[in-house]
């Protein structure tokens, strides 16, 4: 078995801490929830082998998918195998958590970076890109008040920030043989196998 490394792209504002050079130091890239690449290549590069998304997100165009080099689409919506395989207490996993768990369970992935995993904090901006760049299929989230005009989450997320934090720390402790990196606006403590960037 040859070892692999993967950078998993979330969409939180902490993406601003990232660089293309950091992303390019990983063998593979997984995009979660259809992040915006155009105009942000200096932060997140311009490639993704995996496209993890639920059915509410507008798919990348064929041209975008080819340009990014997407080879695998993984549906994270309800009733899918990836969602049914996940179990960790009462945590309702986001697409990013499902992607992380997918690679966590594969022994060949020994180096995993989580970029933009800001844990859906209430009254914090949710995405690194501008409101006008947001997927038009999800404008209802502004219309119903889930997000305010600044793109901040106004409600307690169904994904539950504290449960995500506990899950991630449990996995960092359980998989001591893997090296983890995290870019997050949430306060994580470094561990022997976790570098907080």
Regions inferred by a protein language model and the residue ranges of each:
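Metal-ion/cofactor- or nucleotide/acyl-coenzyme-handling active-site neighborhoods
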Residues: 1-197
């Amino acid at each position: 078995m040859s070892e692999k490394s993967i950078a998993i792209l979330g969409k939180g504002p902490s993406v601003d801490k990232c660089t293309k050079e950091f992303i390019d130091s990983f063998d593979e890239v997984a995009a979660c929830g259809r992040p915006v690449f155009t105009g942000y290549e200096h932060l997140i590069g311009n490639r993704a082998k995996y496209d993890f998304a639920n059915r509410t997100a507008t798919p990348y165009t064929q041209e975008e998918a080819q340009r990014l080099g997407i080879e695998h689409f993984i549906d994270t919506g309800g009733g899918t195998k990836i969602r049914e395989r996940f179990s960790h207490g009462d945590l309702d996993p986001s697409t990013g958590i499902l992607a992380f768990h997918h690679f966590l369970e594969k022994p060949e992935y020994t180096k995993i970076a989580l970029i933009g995993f800001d844990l859906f904090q209430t009254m914090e901006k949710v995405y690194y890109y501008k409101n006008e760049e947001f997927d038009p299929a999800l404008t209802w989230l502004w219309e119903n008040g889930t997000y305010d005009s600044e793109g901040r989450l106004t409600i307690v997320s169904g994904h539950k920030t504290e449960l995500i934090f506990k899950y991630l720390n449990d996995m960092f402790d359980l998989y001591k043989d893997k090296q983890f990196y995290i870019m997050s606006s949430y306060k994580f403590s470094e561990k022997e196998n976790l570098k907080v960037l």
